[in-house]
């Protein structure tokens, strides 16, 4: 029985709900003593919480003796039903029992918030305040936190505890600045509470700015940081705030303001000056102020910068020199990067840049030697591209052996972007992952567990709850339970694979994919490591493909959209980037609304973009626009999805006639360059895993 019907109209949802409830009642009547009748009773009870709460209470209470594994959930659902019946005291007293009745419950924080809410509705303020404080201590980032603080403040006001009310309202305004309750809190604070007026301090503005930065709301953070700096000319955290302000300006692409902020920090020679120097170099590069960037490399050599920081400044200078066509000077600068860097990755980056400039200026023999020197460094992440481009350089020189080098890429890094390129150039056979076992089409949940751990795990109450919730169709609740077990069994890969498979099956793609990326990276990227087929299903989720296909955008291969979701958000529908892109396909609100307007959809707010269907509807259409704009060229369209069409148009004009693999390496923005490689790699893997179909 499906619970979620968000896409249907209200009348249709209502009719569908009645049909489901009737079906569940038939199961209960026809098979009264079976487990399925007990499950039907639970489902019917949950479905009736809003419609017929009295009947819901009756059904859910009867289920308590039949389904003890769900005791904490049943208590929560009964409590919700009692609140609908305007019985807040009964609800609160029941909700209070959850932590003691089910000590390993994953609902304790949620129950604490609902308990506080129930006591507030019952006008028992001292209990409401107590439970709100407990809930905030357990999970202060819960969406219910702002309302809990608002109720706390209201209770303090009712009982004439005005200092406590003021402190709580202030906490609400500072820590949850984006919430509707924060606006109400500010309005309440602006009134005189018991003869005292209130005005935010400099410290208040700084704390509020940090909260906005945590939400990637850069514009709002800038306003608060500027207020802080205006009010606190001698504050000990002033330099720290200026650095945060400069970075926020960069995120907002306000480079003039960022430049002046960083220049001031560098001149002041404070603790933040070194980091500000690197940021200033980045801004000089973005603004094409090469002379100042070169000058900065000289002053950086005499300052207090660390080796990697000096290397970064020289790297930006080298990129500018390369952009100006001063290739010999660029090579010299990149060699300094390789010398200055403390970390192996920074040294490899410098050498890679040297080799790439040599390649793009047709010094193929020299570039091949440089790329092979990188391979010898054995720095993670650089080997496949160095082997590939050494082979490309040899190919340009018409040397024999390039095919063997392409094969070497795929032997060592089978599932990499560079193996995909190498396969295309050398006509290598399609590589199929090595599978440890041949799985039957359908396996019971418990059969996925390794034999030596199965009895122990099957007895675990959290595992039992997770499976029962999965069976009932409560996917989010099942995911919560199963995800909590991945931490407990983090050292047992067989168990983790079983849990991640179950998570993926209930639609919890983000935690499942996270497990795969953290614990199975080698198996997913290198050849010769036996890999269970279930791991590929977890690592490349296909559950949203029907939603993507349903958009009917013919220009978009659904696997390409899935690859973008995988790399943009890792299937986390609540993801927010540092620049404020939102949701599964990481849409900027302005871009989303431009697409909505073009296709006749209603305007959308930032919060609506967290809805997966809304995000996919707009994201797939935007991707389709870009594919049409660039004549189906994947690299151009994917780059534009990340960096914007204006930047990509400039790059196309600069590098017209280049092969696609060369164009990708020539993308000047490192973030975009790496992004394009990741998306194209994931796209290739999706197509390979689905037998090349689209």
Label the predicted regions:
Residues 594:
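Active-site substrate-binding loop specific to GH73 endo-beta-N-acetylglucosaminidase modules
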Residues 585-587, 616:
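Short glycine- and hydrophobic/aromatic-rich loop-to-beta-strand nucleating segment
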Residues 1-579, 585, 597-598, 624, ...:
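Acidic, polar-rich low-complexity tracts and alpha-helical solenoid repeat scaffolds
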Residues 619:
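Histidine- and acidic-residue-rich, metal-dependent catalytic cores
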Residues 405-413, 503, 584, 632, ...:
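Catalytic and substrate-binding regions of cell-wall glycan-acting enzymes that process beta-1,4-linked
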Residues 604-614:
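A short, structured beta-strand-centered segment in the mid-to-C-terminal lobe
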Residues 556-563, 630-638:
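Acidic/histidine metal-binding catalytic segments
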């Amino acid at each position: 029985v499906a619970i979620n019907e968000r896409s249907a109209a209200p009348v249709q949802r209502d009719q569908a709900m009645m049909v489901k409830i009737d079906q569940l009642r038939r199961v209960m009547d026809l098979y009264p003593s079976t487990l399925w009748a007990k499950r039907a009773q639970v489902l019917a009870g949950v479905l009736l919480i809003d419609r017929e709460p009295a009947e819901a209470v009756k059904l859910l209470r009867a289920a308590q003796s039949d389904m003890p594994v769900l005791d904490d959930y049943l208590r929560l659902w009964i409590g919700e039903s009692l609140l609908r019946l305007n019985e807040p005291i009964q609800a609160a007293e029941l909700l209070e029992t959850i932590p003691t009745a089910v000590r390993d419950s994953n609902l304790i924080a949620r129950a604490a918030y609902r308990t506080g809410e129930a006591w507030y509705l019952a006008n028992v303020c001292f209990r409401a305040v107590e439970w709100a404080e407990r809930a905030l201590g357990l999970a202060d980032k819960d969406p219910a936190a702002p309302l809990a603080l608002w109720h706390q403040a209201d209770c303090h006001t009712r009982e004439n505890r005005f200092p406590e009310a003021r402190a709580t309202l202030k906490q609400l305004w500072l820590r949850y600045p984006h919430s509707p309750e924060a606006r109400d809190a500010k309005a309440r604070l602006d009134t005189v509470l018991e003869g005292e007026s209130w005005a935010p301090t400099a410290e208040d503005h700084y704390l509020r700015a940090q909260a906005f930065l945590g939400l990637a709301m850069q514009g709002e953070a800038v306003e608060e940081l500027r207020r802080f700096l205006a009010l606190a000319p001698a504050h000990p955290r002033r330099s720290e705030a200026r650095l945060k302000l400069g970075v926020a300006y960069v995120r907002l692409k306000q480079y003039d303001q960022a430049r002046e902020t960083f220049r001031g920090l560098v001149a002041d020679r404070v603790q933040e000056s070194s980091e500000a120097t690197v940021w200033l170099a980045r801004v000089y590069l973005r603004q094409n102020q090469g002379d100042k960037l070169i000058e900065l490399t000289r002053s950086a050599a005499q300052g207090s910068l660390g080796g990697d920081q000096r290397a970064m400044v020289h790297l930006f200078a080298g990129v500018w020199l390369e952009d100006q066509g001063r290739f010999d000077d660029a090579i010299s600068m990149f060699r300094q990067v390789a010398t200055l860097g403390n970390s192996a990755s920074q040294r490899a980056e410098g050498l890679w840049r040297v080799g790439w400039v040599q390649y793009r200026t047709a010094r193929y023999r020299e570039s091949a030697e440089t790329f092979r020197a990188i391979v010898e460094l054995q720095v993670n992440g650089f080997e496949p591209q160095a082997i590939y481009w050494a082979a490309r350089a040899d190919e340009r020189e018409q040397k024999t052996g390039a095919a063997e080098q392409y094969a070497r890429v795929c032997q060592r890094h089978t599932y990499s972007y560079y193996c995909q390129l190498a396969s295309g150039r050398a006509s290598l056979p399609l590589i199929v992952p090595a599978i440890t076992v041949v799985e039957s089409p359908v396996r019971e949940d418990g059969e996925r567990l390794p034999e030596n751990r199965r009895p122990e795990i099957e007895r675990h109450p959290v595992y039992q709850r997770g499976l029962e919730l999965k069976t009932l169709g409560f996917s989010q609740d099942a995911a919560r339970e199963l995800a909590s077990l991945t931490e407990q069994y983090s050292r047992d890969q067989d168990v983790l694979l079983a849990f991640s498979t179950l998570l993926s099956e209930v639609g919890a793609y983000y935690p499942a994919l996270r497990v795969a990326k953290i614990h199975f990276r080698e198996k997913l990227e290198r050849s010769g490591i036996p890999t269970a087929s279930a791991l590929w299903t977890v690592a490349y989720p296909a559950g949203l493909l029907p939603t993507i296909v349903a958009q009917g955008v013919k220009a978009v291969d659904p696997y390409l959209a899935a690859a973008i979701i995988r790399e943009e958000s890792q299937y986390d529908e609540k993801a927010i980037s540092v620049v404020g892109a939102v949701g599964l396909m990481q849409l900027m609100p302005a871009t989303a609304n431009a697409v909505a307007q073009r296709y006749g959809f209603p305007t959308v707010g930032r919060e609506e973009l967290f809805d997966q269907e809304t995000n996919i509807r707009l994201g797939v259409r935007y991707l389709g626009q870009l594919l049409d704009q660039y004549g189906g060229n994947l690299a151009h369209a994917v780059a534009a999805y990340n960096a914007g069409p204006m930047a990509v148009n400039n790059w196309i004009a600069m590098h017209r006639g280049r092969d696609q693999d060369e164009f990708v390496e020539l993308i000047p923005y490192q973030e975009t360059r790496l992004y394009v490689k990741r998306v194209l790699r994931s796209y290739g893997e999706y197509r390979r895993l689905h037998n090349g179909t689209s």
